[in-house]
């Protein structure tokens, strides 16, 4: 029998990484580590064009990284498994949150065999709260593939890495260079920003010509035999110094930076077209029957495939949220329900959507004959359960539904307020 997942609030940080990450200076909304001062950070009148001084630029960057690298747990040994997990976790996730999840993950799945032997339910539960759950399912599929086709040894060849589920060009480059020190340039948003400023890339970085130029420059500035340090240094510099609010006085590349020399740092990178934000009104309901509540397991397709949830869906034009939750329950389960109380609104977002989740307490509409509820007719799920509220913690749920589930057992009772 596998050990049960640790309860919320009992998570461990065995090596104190989270505490180390929190030992920082705070600037505005950003938390930044204390950086080693850089001499000559403000460029002298004689700007040193980066194309003509690549060895100096490389040395300055590596020296800065050696002095300022954050104590991240996957940097202790650079094992392929740990590098891979960290790279997947940090997609769409802030660093401090990623470190916390990484440490918990390693307690539960310390190596490839442990992950490959896990069930999808266990993996999704460990991933809960990070979102984009296809990443977790791909991790499990890739781990099993490595065990079956590579004898349990994570491949070092970039083509073999790229063939694993859920691994794209960036993650391939990151694993190849950071885990195996292969001469492959990593390009993420941080690297794009650094290169766009140092080399004055004057068009949106995601456009074809700019992307090609950045890729070519990233390869050119990669020092021989130092891919691991260099790629991490570029990403670290973009995260800590060359951010949206640049700290040019702390930058080791200031004397090489063309945008700084021209006084246009805040104009680089050139912004692309912003994605439009779409608001969505969604409903869900907690259907109670005596001391148990109804949950269902989503179909395997989609962003939250395979997760447990309270049934619900979008509010259609002309509907009130109360009408929508009654309709959704009828469509998804066959149950006829009525709203007994509002539980509040949970606000959250994903990709370009901003969601308001209206939550309601529900009861079955039946005659007065006491009997168990009829079995549901599921149209949007593969399974369902009637559970005591305390049992909900064992299920993997989307973040908003987890917030609702946790509120049901909170000392103050259900939400009864808007988040």
Predicted regions mapped to residue ranges:
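Catalytic cores of DNA base-excision repair glycosylases
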Residues: 32, 53-55, 59-60, 64-249, ...
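Short, contiguous pre-domain boundary segments
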Residues: 24, 28-50, 69-70
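NUDIX/MutT-family hydrolases
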Residues: 361-412
């Amino acid at each position: 029998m596998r050990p049960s997942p640790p309860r919320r609030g009992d998570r461990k940080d065995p090596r104190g990484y989270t505490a180390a990450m929190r030992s920082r200076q705070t600037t505005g909304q950003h938390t930044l580590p204390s950086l080693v001062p850089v001499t000559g950070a403000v460029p002298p009148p004689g700007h040193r064009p980066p194309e003509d001084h690549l060895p100096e630029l490389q040395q300055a960057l590596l020296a800065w990284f050696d002095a300022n690298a954050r104590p991240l747990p996957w940097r202790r040994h650079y094992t392929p498994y740990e590098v891979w997990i960290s790279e997947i976790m940090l997609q769409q996730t802030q660093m401090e949150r990623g470190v916390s999840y990484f440490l918990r993950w390693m307690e539960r799945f310390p190596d490839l065999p442990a992950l490959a032997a896990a069930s999808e339910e266990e993996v999704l539960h460990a991933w809960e709260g990070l979102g984009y759950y296809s990443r977790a399912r791909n991790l499990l599929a890739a781990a099993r593939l490595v065990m079956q086709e590579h004898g349990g040894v994570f491949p070092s060849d970039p083509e073999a890495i790229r063939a694993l589920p859920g691994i794209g060009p960036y993650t391939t480059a990151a694993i190849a260079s950071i885990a195996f020190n292969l001469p492959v340039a990593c390009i993420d948003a941080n690297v794009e920003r650094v290169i766009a400023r140092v080399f004055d890339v004057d068009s949106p970085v995601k456009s074809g010509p700019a992307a090609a130029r950045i890729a070519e420059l990233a390869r050119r500035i990669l020092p021989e035999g130092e891919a691991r340090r260099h790629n991490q240094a570029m990403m670290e510099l973009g995260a800590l110094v060359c951010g949206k609010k640049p700290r040019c006085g702390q930058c080791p590349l200031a004397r090489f930076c063309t945008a700084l020399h021209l006084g246009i740092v805040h104009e680089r990178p050139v912004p692309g077209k912003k994605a439009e934000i779409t608001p969505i009104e969604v409903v869900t309901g907690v259907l109670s029957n005596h001391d148990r509540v109804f949950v269902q397991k989503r179909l395997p397709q989609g962003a939250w495939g395979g997760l447990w949830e309270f049934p619900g869906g979008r509010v259609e034009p002309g509907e009130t949220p109360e009408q929508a939750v009654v309709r959704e329950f009828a469509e998804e389960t066959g149950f006829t329900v009525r709203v007994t109380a509002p539980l509040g609104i949970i606000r959250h977002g994903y990709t370009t959507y901003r969601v308001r989740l209206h939550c309601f307490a529900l009861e079955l509409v039946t005659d007065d004959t006491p009997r168990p509820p009829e079995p549901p007719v599921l149209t949007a799920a593969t399974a369902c359960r009637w559970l005591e509220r305390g049992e909900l913690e064992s299920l993997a749920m989307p973040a908003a539904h987890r917030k609702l589930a946790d509120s049901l057992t909170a000392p103050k009772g259900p939400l009864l307020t808007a988040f």
